[in-house]
Curated annotation (Swiss-Prot):
Mg(2+) binds at D450, D452, D454. One of its GO terms (biological process) is DNA-templated transcription. One of its GO terms (molecular function) is magnesium ion binding. Belongs to the RNA polymerase beta' chain family. The keyword DNA repair does not apply. Binds 1 Mg(2+) ion per subunit. Binds 2 Zn(2+) ions per subunit. Gene3D superfamilies: 1.10.132.30, 1.10.150.390, 1.10.1790.20, 1.10.40.90, 2.40.40.20, 2.40.50.100, RNA polymerase II, clamp domain, RNA polymerase Rpb1, domain 3. Its cofactor is Mg(2+); Zn(2+). It comes from Streptococcus pneumoniae serotype 2 (strain D39 / NCTC 7466). It comes from the Bacteria. The lineage of its organism: Bacteria, Bacillati, Bacillota, Bacilli, Lactobacillales. The keyword Metal-binding applies. This is DNA-directed RNA polymerase subunit beta'. DNA-dependent RNA polymerase catalyzes the transcription of DNA into RNA using the four ribonucleoside triphosphates as substrates.
Length: 1225
């Protein structure tokens, strides 16, 4: 076998007959499989040991030679080679076909490759191949046309007319084979190139397609006649096994049935030919042989599929590769692994952030080999067998050994569905009793896990390298930030939030108010002994608290609460004291009003202060983000654990409970509803009198009930008691929101009907009062719709993620700086008055392209090619700069990836991205993972003024990434200039917009009901939208440049996600959009050897042009093509990646004809062949490093060179570096 990590590329071509013979170990002549009595394979049958190898290791069929010492000997009695059984998985056989047979992939595929090669229609081909018509192979001197088709009857008539032997016409695959042999590729290609110079329309399209196929044959060295099979390979028997079932019956792979049909028909045909049977019988047998081979290769592609028992279609070779259950997706891209287990998860509140609880019986099973090795090493038993017995008996001594073995041996926990990389994290195992895995409560958000019966899988990394990577790169404590937006993904939730909220509350007039303490311990002691309440405002000496005080703040008394003293106790030392829950306090320190000179009038000072709100979930998130920014991961994860413990402790002490009496009652609810009823009556009256339309009435009624619900909501909020447990849960962000609260205490409001339209009858009751039967019935509609929507959304979102991953999986950070001279000019993204994404957010973590200066003073804020930090971004925006040119993925020149400077920081770590980071996959996950949060629906804009549906949510994202024509498309102008007139034409119900510019005039017809974005006298740019709606990106590409289209797509995706409150970094969307515009269509080949009309990678196109320009020729011209992500994935340079994505047979057919070479640059290709992926630590530049020991002395005191040798030293160092670079490449 070839070592997978050795080879550089993989090529696929058509197999010539000689190639098939060279693979084969012998001919399969009989359809028999296994002898039913002896259960031994039959000779010359489909499982023959002589051809395929022995069924038992190191043993021939007759048993003359047994044991390994006879390896390689071929038995003189039975002819079987003594070797491993494993060869039955790799040795192939063959069947010599008695008549040539066409390969269905090349004849039936779309477009038909055989048809294009011969310039015949697939219909005509089918008639010839299946013996329904003759084709003229050589007309000789007759007036018949070469390749013309004739029926049996016509053939007889022509024979009578011109005489026997006056021309050659044949039927069947044999005829096609003769025609294919006659094709002169060079001559045909030259003729087609000539034809293309003048051809137009349909002729031109056909010529381009033919040229493409013929050129593929010519360049790859494949011969067209190899599309016809004279010899059929038989795959190894262990890949189509026969298994004996309990009842003595056999279960066999469908392929055996299909092969059996071929062999039977082939043998019958041979016998008929020997007997010189009548032509019609032979013809029929040949047709049946052709059909049998078709079914074997791709059953059901032509006509009705061959079925097995129970009329189930048999699975052919093509089906073995296709689809989710095919070879690619089932066995190559994802495999089941050893050393893994799964169990239900339970919460582990006492664990540290980097730990997980593993049940003892699970751990002993997972770490069995490690424990056994240790048992033998300690001489408890003598050999491994005995050690295994010891473990299986559950001996007492194994538990201590297990404890030691798992120490510092991380395990991976994974929860399905793994939507992003945080779905697999590493933990240090802690042995526990019970049978459930214990999970740290803070990592639940990343996994999207809860403890209502979720299960998780556990995996053990075995090798030292795998353990090191798990520990350094995947440890849960390292994953503080979410890769999609760089915000903390581990924020306290539920009880933890509630505890910290309760802890930091302030109340006026509670016991012990105004007491002053010398330090924290005294305050805690007073609290424990009941002298002071947790929420009482007290004083504490600032000097006793280890915080970064200013000079004025020292030697003072700080006014705070006991709870806040405890809360600040867990914070890192360098952080300011947190007194107010806002960012100013977090970054600049406590405001001056909370400080009092020693011995000042404290009670008076306290009474002058307003009560502060407690710390809510959002504030805790900001604190964590700030701490991460200042102290990085280790300190942050330690703080998170302290915050978790504090939160759980105090939510327990607070003892918050919920009773029905905690739901407040709004006194004037009846009046509010009565008022609305009256208004609705008035609206209905107006409608009855014909003053308003039905649509207007509907909108007015629903608006009225919405207003009523909002009024109730406002009353509720105004009257709420801050110490009400439900209000505390809601306000802190622990659970529930204002809408839930208003359904409990206000009114449920309007509901959606099953068709998605909002019903006019609102639900007036709330849950405290209880719903009437009719109201209950109405509310079930909404609930049901919610459930179905979620189910559909999950599937759609998952498929979107799969397509995104596929198109971007080969985008890896490949170099430090690509040295591009272009940049991207960015400003904030806004929709009308609404800000979608601010400039500050867009700048953070990117590199500048040009110097940014202060618009007023002209002072340099930041130079070119410098990283814009959060603070720099704020400084740029505060200076009043509105647009900045940055380095962007769009303008990066790196081949097969991106460079570090164009990408910026890695959002998951907050540091500059490393070479080797698989940014394409991360981008795909970041866009796909929040997909389930997006809505499914297409909104009707409501009201009368529009007749267009605006697509939003998930369908809109799919529309953008698939580059489809959008629903509700906007009309765009191709002229830059001024709108001179807008004319309405009532007869055709359209409007005409006239635009006059320097380059010419444009006249655009828009629907009568479309809402205009321009008015007469307004200026418009090229590609600007004249009406409301979405622009079709392909049209925009025709009038503007690539960068404008990329920028438009980026903005559109951001609008969808941000409108749903999902934040995604620009760079992720940039990576995806760049993959959609990677191809160029050749318009004129110039002096290059490119073909007109072909799609090619933009890099290959520029390379071809470079070579021609250097030689002084005319370069080719091309037009950039925008493709949807599905098409872009299938057009990738890697055929393995494309075939494992979709349309497997089409991709492989095409790749084989072209003799495509897969250079294994992406991740999928390498996973498929089992090679280590070329990203992260698997990248060549990291794999080829040779570690060597350094003498400590030299390391600490490097030897000083003498002055004379300086130059030579430098040169030596340079060449050394260069050679290293070369080997790394």
């Amino acid at each position: 076998m070839v070592d997978v990590n050795r080879f550089k590329s993989m090529q696929i071509t058509l197999a010539s007959p000689s190639k098939v013979r060279s693979w084969s170990y012998g001919e399969v002549k009989k359809p028999e499989t296994i002898n039913y009595r002896t259960l031994k394979p039959e000779r010359e049958g489909l499982f023959d040991e002589v051809i395929f190898g022995p069924t038992k290791d190191w043993e021939c069929a007759c048993g003359k030679y047994k044991r390994i010492r006879y390896r390689g000997i071929v038995c003189d009695r039975c002819g079987v080679e003594v070797t491993r059984t494993k060869v039955r998985r790799e040795r192939m056989g063959h069947i010599e076909l008695k008549a040539p047979v066409s390969h269905i992939w090349y004849f039936k595929g779309i477009p038909s490759r055989m048809g294009l090669t011969l310039d015949m229609s697939p219909r005509a081909l089918e008639e010839v191949i299946y013996f329904a018509a003759y084709v003229v192979i050589d007309p000789k001197d007759t007036p018949l046309e070469h390749k013309s088709i004739m029926t049996e009857r016509e053939y007889r008539e022509r024979l009578r007319e011109y005489g026997y032997g006056s021309f050659v016409a044949k039927m069947g695959a044999e005829a096609i084979q003769d025609l294919l042999k006659q094709v002169d590729l060079e001559k045909e290609i030259a003729e087609l190139k000539e034809e293309l110079k003048t051809a137009t329309g349909q002729k031109r399209v056909k010529a381009i397609r033919r040229l493409d196929v013929l050129d593929a044959f010519y360049k790859s060295g494949n011969k067209p006649e190899w599309m016809i099979l004279n010899i059929l390979p038989v795959i190894p028997p262990d890949l189509r096994p026969m298994l004996q079932l309990d009842g003595g019956r056999f279960a066999s792979s469908d392929l055996n049935d299909l092969y059996r049909r071929v062999i039977n028909r082939n043998n019958r045909l041979a016998r008929l030919l020997e007997l010189n049977a009548p032509g019609i019988i032979v013809q029929n047998e040949k047709r049946m042989l052709q059909e049998a081979v078709d079914a074997l290769i791709d059953n059901g592609r032509r006509g009705r599929p061959i079925t097995g028992p129970g009329s189930r279609p048999l699975k052919s070779l093509s089906h073995m590769l296709k689809g989710k259950q095919g070879r690619f997706r089932q066995n190559l891209l994802g495999k089941r692994v050893d050393f893994s287990g799964r169990s239900v998860i339970a919460v582990g509140p006492t664990l540290k952030m980097y730990q997980c609880g593993v049940p003892r019986e699970m751990a002993i099973e997972l770490f069995k080999p490690f424990v056994m090795r240790e048992i033998v090493a300690r001489d408890i038993v003598q050999n491994v067998k005995a050690a295994k017995r010891l473990v299986e008996r559950g001996d007492e001594r194994i538990w201590d050994i297990l404890e030691e073995v798992i120490k510092e041996h991380p395990v991976l926990l994974n929860r399905a569905p793994t939507l992003h990389r945080l779905g697999i994290q590493a933990f240090e195992p802690v042995l526990i009793d019970g049978k459930a895995l214990r999970l740290h409560p803070l990592v639940c958000e990343a996994y999207n896990a809860d403890f209502d019966g979720d299960q998780m899988a556990i995996h053990v990394p075995l090798s030292e390298e795998a353990q090191a990577e798990a520990r350094i790169l995947m440890l849960a404590a390292e994953h503080i930030l979410n890769p999609k937006d760089g915000k903390p993904v581990v924020t306290p939730s539920q009880d933890m939030v509630l505890g910290n909220y309760y802890l930091t509350m302030e109340e006026a007039g509670r016991e012990g108010e105004g007491m002053v303490f010398k330090d924290r311990d005294e305050a805690v002691m007073a609290y424990r002994n009941g002298y002071v309440h947790l929420h009482s405002r007290v004083g504490i000496a600032t000097d006793s608290l280890n915080k970064p005080w200013t000079e004025e703040q020292r030697h003072k008394v700080l006014l705070t609460t006991v709870g806040k003293i405890l809360f600040n106790d867990i914070m890192p030392e360098g952080l300011p004291y947190l007194q107010e829950p806002n960012n100013a306090n977090l970054t600049e320190g406590v405001p001056a009003k909370y400080f009092l000179p020693l011995g000042g009038a404290i009670k008076e000072a306290i009474s002058n202060l307003e009560l502060n709100p407690p710390f809510k979930k959002k504030n805790l998130g900001n604190i964590i983000a700030e701490i991460f920014k200042r102290f990085r991961t280790t300190e942050t994860s330690a703080l998170l654990d302290r915050m978790k413990n504090l939160g759980y402790h105090h939510s327990t002490l607070a003892g918050l409970t919920v009773g029905i009496a905690d739901i407040p009652v709004v006194d004037d609810k009846a009046e509010i509803i009565e008022e609305s009823h009256k208004r609705v009556e008035q609206i209905t009256k107006q409608f009855r009198r014909g003053m308003i339309t039905d649509d207007e009435r509907y909108n007015a009624v629903t608006a009225e009930w919405r207003a009523a619900r909002e009024k109730l909501e406002k009353r509720l909020i105004a009257n709420q008691d801050p110490k009400n447990p439900i209000v505390m849960m809601m306000d802190s962000g622990a659970r529930g929101n204002i809408s839930n609260f208003s359904q409990l205490a206000g009114m449920r409001g309007l509901m959606a009907a099953p068709n998605g339209r909002i019903m006019e009858l609102p639900i007036l009751s709330n849950f405290r009062e209880g719903l009437s039967v009719l109201e209950m019935f109405f509310s079930t509609h909404g609930a049901r719709k919610g459930m179905t929507d979620t189910a559909l959304k999950t599937a759609d979102s998952g498929y979107l993620t799969r397509r995104l991953v596929d198109v971007a999986q080969d985008v890896i950070i490949r170099e430090d700086d690509c040295g591009t001279d272009r940049g991207l000019l960015i400003r904030s993204i806004a929709e009308g008055k609404e800000m979608i994404e601010s400039l500050e957010e867009r700048l953070n973590g990117r590199y500048t392209k040009k110097t940014v200066k202060h618009p007023e003073t002209g002072a340099v804020i930041i130079g070119p090619n410098e990283l814009i930090t959060e603070d720099k971004a704020r400084e740029i925006v505060n200076a009043g700069v509105e647009e900045v040119t940055i380095r962007s993925v769009f303008t990066c020149n790196t081949r097969h990836g991106v460079c570090r400077h164009c990408y910026g920081i890695n959002l998951a770590t907050g540091d500059a991205v490393e070479v080797g980071e698989a940014v394409g996959t991360i981008a795909a996950q970041s866009i796909g993972e929040p997909g389930t949060q997006l809505t499914m629906r297409t909104f009707h804009t409501g009201g009368v003024a529009s007749n267009t549906d605006i697509t939003q949510g998930l369908p809109r994202v799919q529309e953008i990434f698939e580059a489809r024509n959008p629903k509700g498309e906007a009309v765009i102008t191709e002229v830059k200039g001024q709108v001179t007139a807008i004319e309405e034409d009532a007869s055709t119900r359209t409007k005409k917009v006239f635009v006059k510019g320097e380059t010419g005039e444009g006249e655009y017809v828009v629907p009568f009901t479309a809402r205009m974005r321009v008015e007469v006298g307004g200026q418009v740019a090229r590609g600007a939208a004249l009406t409301e709606g979405s622009i079709q990106p392909k049209r925009l590409l025709a009038v503007r440049d690539v960068l404008s289209v990329e920028t438009y797509l980026l903005g559109e995706v951001q609008k969808v996600y941000r409108s749903q409150g999902v934040e995604i970094g620009d760079k992720h969307i940039e990576v995806m959009v760049r993959q959609m515009i990677r191809k160029v269509r050749v318009m004129d080949p110039g002096d290059t050897d490119l073909l007109m009309g072909t799609l090619m990678d933009i890099n290959d196109f520029t390379d071809a042009n470079k070579d021609v320009l250097i030689a002084g020729g005319v370069p080719a011209t091309g037009r950039p093509v925008l493709m949807g992500i599905t098409k872009a994935s299938l057009e990738t340079n890697s055929f393995l990646s494309a075939a494992s994505f979709q349309e497997t047979t089409r991709v492989l057919t095409d790749a084989a004809i072209r003799g495509k070479k897969d250079h294994l640059l992406g991740l999928k290709e390498n996973v498929i062949i089992g090679k280590i992926i070329p990203a992260g630590t698997g990248m060549a530049r990291y794999r080829n490093l040779e570690p060597h020991a350094v003498n400590e002395e030299e390391y600490l005191n490097p030897p000083v060179e003498e002055e004379g040798n300086e130059e030579t030293t430098e040169v030596v160092v340079d060449t050394a570096v260069e050679t290293v670079e070369e080997t790394v490449e």
